[in-house]
């Protein structure tokens, strides 16, 4: 009887040891599976990313400016410049086009109007630099819910980047994010197809998403009621980012500023607009609740919260991960 009990005890011990070893091997397998992968969770905006980071739901967060700089007052630190990592990954030192200006086809046909609009957008770049300290007050007065610290303005990379200069990048985005292989040239504004039609009159509706894109039209907001563009008064509407595409889809925006690939994809699918220019290039930063710096290799096995699913942030981050031998978890 005693021998039988000893035998049973021995078997039980072996079973426990095997189970323990199996658990160890399983853990090793899981760690190996995570060695080259990064879990990416997408959020609607920078505020949601920051909330998830503060709650410990994610390890790192990717947000745009001005949220990255404004986050310092909430205990967040910038640990990675995605523009620098993108340049290393792709060899493209000029960054990636983000928010872009789309105009109705009828307006794009009038070179007088387009030239006047581009001139105002160029003047705006100087305006926001000279008035950086007042951007929060100005834009919040127009409906923005974002803060625009003066230090963030240069990092928002606001400019006027003509369609021809960003076309190749946008086409690649459309291929990667929207499965569009052949983007028609007709998506982009072509001044040779426009004619001088003189000044017009009336009020045009411009829609722009909250955040850095609104900086591109700060001068129009500041001088609304006095500044005209080729005879037109332009009324600026700052709206939530997740509603911006509807203003091209419905056609109620005469001018719409939205993510480069999103607007181009709508035009490729029949919307009567032209891609005029990009307004911001590369404004993405990775933030953390800890100070220091993080490399792409450090992200293996981590969870990263990111804005912009199916938009430029996803495109840029995946390009960086791929170049560093990492993949996103499905």
Question: Whereabouts are the PLM-identified features?
Answer:
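Short polybasic/polar patches that bind polyanions
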Residues: 72, 140, 178, 267, ...
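Helix N-cap/coil-helix junction residues
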Residues: 144-148, 182-183, 271, 326
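Solvent-exposed, acidic/flexible segments
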Residues: 42, 46, 61, 91-96, ...
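Sec-dependent N-terminal signal peptides
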Residues: 6-18, 26
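N-terminal hydrophobic or amphipathic helices and topogenic motifs
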Residues: 2, 6, 23-34, 150-235
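Secondary-structure end/capping motifs
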Residues: 108-179
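Pocket-lining segment of extracytoplasmic ligand-binding domains
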Residues: 46-137, 260-262, 291, 330
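Short, glycine-/small- and polar/acidic-enriched structural segments
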Residues: 30-45, 52-66, 75-85, 200-330
């Amino acid at each position: 009887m005693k021998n039988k009990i000893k035998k049973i005890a021995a078997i039980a011990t072996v079973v426990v040891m095997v189970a323990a070893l199996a658990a160890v091997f399983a853990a090793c397998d899981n760690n190996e599976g995570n060695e080259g992968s990064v879990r990416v969770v997408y959020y609607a905006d920078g505020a949601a990313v920051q909330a998830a980071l503060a709650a410990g739901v994610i390890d790192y967060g990717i947000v745009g400016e001005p949220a990255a700089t404004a986050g310092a007052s909430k205990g967040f630190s910038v640990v990675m410049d995605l523009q620098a990592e993108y340049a290393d990954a792709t060899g493209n030192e000029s960054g990636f086009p983000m928010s872009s200006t789309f105009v109705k086809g009828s307006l794009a046909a009038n070179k007088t109007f387009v030239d006047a609009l581009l001139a105002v957008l160029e003047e705006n770049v100087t305006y926001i630099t000279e008035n950086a300290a007042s951007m929060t007050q100005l834009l919040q007065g127009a409906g923005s819910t974002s803060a625009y610290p003066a230090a963030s303005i240069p990092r928002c990379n606001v400019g006027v980047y003509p369609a021809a200069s960003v076309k190749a990048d946008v086409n690649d985005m459309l291929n990667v994010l929207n499965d569009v292989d052949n983007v028609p040239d007709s998506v982009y504004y072509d001044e040779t197809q426009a004619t001088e039609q003189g000044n017009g009159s009336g009020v045009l509706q411009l829609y722009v998403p909250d955040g850095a894109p609104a900086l591109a039209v700060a001068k129009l907001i500041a001088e609304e009621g006095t500044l005209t563009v080729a005879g037109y008064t332009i009324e600026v509407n700052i709206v939530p980012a997740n509603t911006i595409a509807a203003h091209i889809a419905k056609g109620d925006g005469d001018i719409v500023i939205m993510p480069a690939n999103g607007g181009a994809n709508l035009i490729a699918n029949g919307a009567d607009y032209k891609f005029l220019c990009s307004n911001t290039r590369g404004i993405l930063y990775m933030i953390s609740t800890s100070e220091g710096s993080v490399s792409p290799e450090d992200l293996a096995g981590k969870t990263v919260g990111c804005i912009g699913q199916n938009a430029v942030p996803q495109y840029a981050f995946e390009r960086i991960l791929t170049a560093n031998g990492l993949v996103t978890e499905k």
